[in-house]
Regions:
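Compositionally biased intrinsically disordered regions enriched in Thr/Gly
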Residues: 1-126
Length: 126
């Protein structure tokens, strides 16, 4: 395994860190997964999906519908697994909070081939 991290946002309300974890399984490329860690620095509590949705002012169904529309426009025929954007908590569990947005990260292969990379869909914070 290898790993790296990037501080996405360090504000008074949220500290967000993006972790990238890779494993070489002997294939053509490593398997990489993103993990979003979003913490309220005042309480130490890690934010959950419900918290992210509150920050956007949207429901999971609304986020999923807009995500699918953006993915169709961006990926076209490379959108091979649209069900990866269905309104299920497991599809939107990886997210990163910034000062102005909540960005949901869809893992490699979740909606598109590895060559298309991880997909990120951002929504303004309300």
């Amino acid at each position: 395994f290898t790993g790296s991290f990037d501080t996405v946002y360090a504000g008074s309300d949220v500290v967000a860190v993006k972790l990238l974890l890779s494993q070489d399984t002997g294939g053509a490329h490593p398997n990489t997964a993103a993990v979003g860690v979003n913490v309220d620095p005042k309480t130490g509590r890690q934010l959950a999906l419900d918290d992210a949705l509150v920050l956007t002012g949207m429901t999971l169904e609304q986020v999923a519908a807009e995500s699918l529309a953006q993915l169709k426009a961006k990926l076209g025929p490379d959108l091979i697994s649209p069900q990866g954007a269905d309104p299920k908590p497991e599809n939107y569990g990886t997210f990163l909070v910034s000062a102005s947005a909540v960005t949901f990260v869809l893992q490699s292969y979740q909606v598109a081939p590895y060559s298309s990379g991880m997909q990120e869909i951002s929504f303004p914070r309300k």
